[in-house]
């Protein structure tokens, strides 16, 4: 199986012949190598509603007639205000099966809203992490989160093959907490650092994260590069 990284927290993969993207922050993201006007997807999965994760979901969903998976509140917002027709609302602890595999939402410590042009934020449900089971593999996309001890419980319940872990600090875990999460709680086979170097406030050296991790393998990906396992 192959998972490709496209800047910030955007991940693309194919499962059982279906094309899936997570947190499609494409336009307005100089670190992303994708083109939202030509990208072909069947499913879009969202961890929360912040602009650097919500991204181009409306354009992609409406042009591709793709199914959008996310919090119930976020799905209601997309269908009511943006005409997105195929939405699947979920919440923390819930699991659902799709053509490509299954999605289970787990806890994340963060916030979730979308700010309109008038500057007023709209509450879009709880922020969440993802447990994806695809073609016999388990992927943990942490979303945006601080460190919390139940990461250990999540990994005990779902032994992780690949973990996408935010390291940018300021808004999420930094390198110290992210490496602790991997070494002490999650212990995946492969870790991939995400959510860094997109903006000045989250500039980090991913090599420092790699040097601090002693559980499993760390793969540092440039936008467009993939991890295969």
Curated annotation (Swiss-Prot):
Keyword annotations from UniProtKB, A to Z: Hydrolase
Q: Protein transport as a keyword?
A: no
User: Does the keyword Disulfide bond feature in the UniProt annotation?
Assistant: no
Q: Which GO terms describe its molecular function?
A: hydrolase activity
Q: Which Gene3D superfamilies match?
A: Ribonuclease Z/Hydroxyacylglutathione hydrolase-like (3.60.15.10)
Q: Name one Pfam family in it.
A: Lactamase_B_2
Q: Which family does it belong to?
A: Belongs to the UPF0173 family.
What is the name attached to this protein's record?
Answer: UPF0173 metal-dependent hydrolase SH1218
Give the classification, highest ranks: Bacteria, Bacillati, Bacillota, Bacilli, Bacillales
């Amino acid at each position: 199986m192959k998972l490709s990284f496209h800047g910030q927290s955007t991940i693309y993969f194919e499962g059982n012949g279906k094309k899936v993207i997570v947190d499609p922050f494409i336009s307005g993201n100089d670190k992303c190598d994708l083109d939202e006007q030509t990208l072909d997807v069947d499913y879009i999965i969202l961890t929360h509603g912040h602009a650097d994760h919500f991204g181009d979901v409306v354009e992609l969903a409406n042009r591709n007639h793709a199914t959008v998976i996310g919090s119930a509140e976020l799905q209601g917002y997309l269908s009511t205000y943006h005409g997105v027709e195929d939405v699947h609302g979920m919440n923390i602890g819930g699991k659902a099966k799709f053509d490509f595999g299954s999605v289970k939402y787990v806890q994340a410590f963060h916030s979730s809203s979308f700010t309109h042009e008038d500057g007023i934020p709209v509450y879009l449900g709880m922020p969440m992490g993802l447990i994806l089971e695809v073609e016999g593999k388990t992927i943990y996309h942490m979303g945006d989160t601080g460190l919390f001890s139940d990461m250990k419980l999540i990994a005990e319940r779902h032994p992780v093959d690949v973990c996408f872990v935010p390291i940018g600090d300021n808004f999420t875990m930094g390198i110290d907490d992210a490496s602790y999460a991997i070494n002490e709680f999650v212990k995946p086979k492969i870790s991939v650092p995400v959510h860094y170097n997109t903006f000045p406030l989250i500039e980090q050296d991913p090599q420092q994260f790699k040097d601090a991790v002693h559980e499993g393998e760390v793969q540092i990906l440039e936008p467009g590069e993939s991890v295969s396992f």
